[in-house]
Amino acid sequence: MHIITIRLSLANVFLVRGERWIVIDSGAPGDGPAILRAAARHGIAPADIGLILLTHGHIDHFGGAAELRASTGAPIAVHRADLALLREGRNPTSLRSTGLEGQLLRPFLPWRTTPLEPDMTFEGSFDLSPFGIATRTVHTPGHSAGHSVLPLPDGNLIAGDLLRGGFLGGRLRGRLPNPPYVVTDAAQQAASLQLALGLPAHTWHIGHGGPLAVEHIRARAKRPGLA
């Protein structure tokens, strides 16, 4: 399955092809036009986009969604457990850093933005069959309460912020598996990582850095510090 990766200043956005194109995550506030320009370079017009799917409700992942919806008419979908974050236009104050880099980055994270009302919310999993891909999201809480990943039929996994790659937003050693910068629940995060490692995937496409080879994730998970 063809995956288009758009690397923005704060986070990655992915496009996958169903009946129409599906945009997974939307970057930070103001990133909508950059996503559309990148899509156009691949011959994708706004009318070709049929869904905006959010892996979770942090501002660096939903910030551009309203702009994308206004330009494409595509609905926005997110797990119900993160609905309040979108409606309040904020990141949760309960975010806890997983290491020094997360502590250093906290002051620079976008903490508030314009509230967003999604078009669709889901409990558990979201079925993408109506959009032309025979798969469902998998709920992987920990980074956020509603964090979800998307396994694709060909063995790729759109993994959001379940892990990150390398350092400095993936600019340094971007294919090295590392824990996310922040979590809301460390125990849930550890359980979700194990759940995702049980999915039939060979490559994880993540929000910061990547992609990550599953064999590298498994090797790294044998040592302390990944979850």
Describe the residue ranges of each PLM region.
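Conserved beta-strand hairpin/beta-sheet module of binuclear metal-dependent hydrolase folds
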Residues: 1-42, 149-165
